[in-house]
């Protein structure tokens, strides 16, 4: 198996010294650099760069700068996704994001883990676990999502949370480690919106 194949199979792989992966990361970093230095008002150029980065035709995806990702092609974005400023997608493992997702500033989605033994860690070994984000979710600022986590549809993750385990659908979850506080009633029609129902 190539190191890339090992990475995608969630096996230990050489993340630091494999030239093919180094080249793929360099490609993504160059596109991120260009995106981060493109005027926010130049929406056509930004759309072109975003599609080039993720190697797909995105549908109403908005990314505020600065933004960073390792590969880009291993992020699968739904429709109507908003990524606020200074977010990082560590996408050695696949990051799947559903439709209508709001991501606050300074959020990180980290699929990589390293050996605890420093001899192996210093040899460049790494393993990547996928992250799955359901549709209609919202992340407050400074949220960290760790490898292997699934966050269910319609959930809200409070600011500053560190998500180490799966979050069920329609949950309000906060903290370090992130824990469910209560369920969210996502069946309320929009006309009932007021100071009580907006909580």
Curated annotation (Swiss-Prot):
Signal keyword on record: no
EC number: 2.3.1.-
Keywords on record: Acyltransferase, Repeat, Transferase
Pfam families with a match to the protein in the record: Hexapep, Hexapep_2, Mac
The organism's place on the tree of life at top rank: Bacteria
Similarity-based family: Belongs to the transferase hexapeptide repeat family.
The name this protein goes by in its record: Putative acetyltransferase SAV2555
């Amino acid at each position: 198996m190539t190191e890339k194949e090992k990475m995608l199979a969630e096996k230990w792989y050489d993340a630091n010294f494999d030239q093919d992966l180094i080249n793929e990361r360099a490609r993504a970093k160059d596109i991120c650099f260009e995106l981060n230095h493109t005027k926010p008002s130049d929406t056509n150029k930004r759309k072109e760069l975003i599609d080039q980065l993720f190697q797909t035709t995105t549908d109403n995806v908005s990314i505020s700068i600065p933004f960073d990702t390792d590969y880009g092609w291993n992020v699968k974005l739904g429709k109507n996704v908003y990524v606020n400023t200074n977010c990082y997608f560590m996408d050695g493992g696949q990051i799947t994001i559903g439709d209508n997702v709001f991501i606050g500033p300074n959020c990180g989605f980290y699929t990589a883990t390293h050996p605890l033994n420093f001899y192996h860690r210093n040899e460049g070994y790494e393993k990547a676990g996928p992250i799955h984000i359901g549709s209609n979710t919202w992340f407050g600022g400074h949220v960290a999502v760790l490898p292997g986590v699934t966050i269910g549809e319609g959930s809200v993750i409070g600011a500053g949370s560190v998500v180490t385990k799966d979050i069920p659908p329609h949950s309000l979850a906060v903290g370090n480690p992130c824990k469910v506080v209560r369920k969210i009633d996502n069946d309320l029609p929009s006309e009932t919106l007021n100071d009580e129902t907006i909580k």
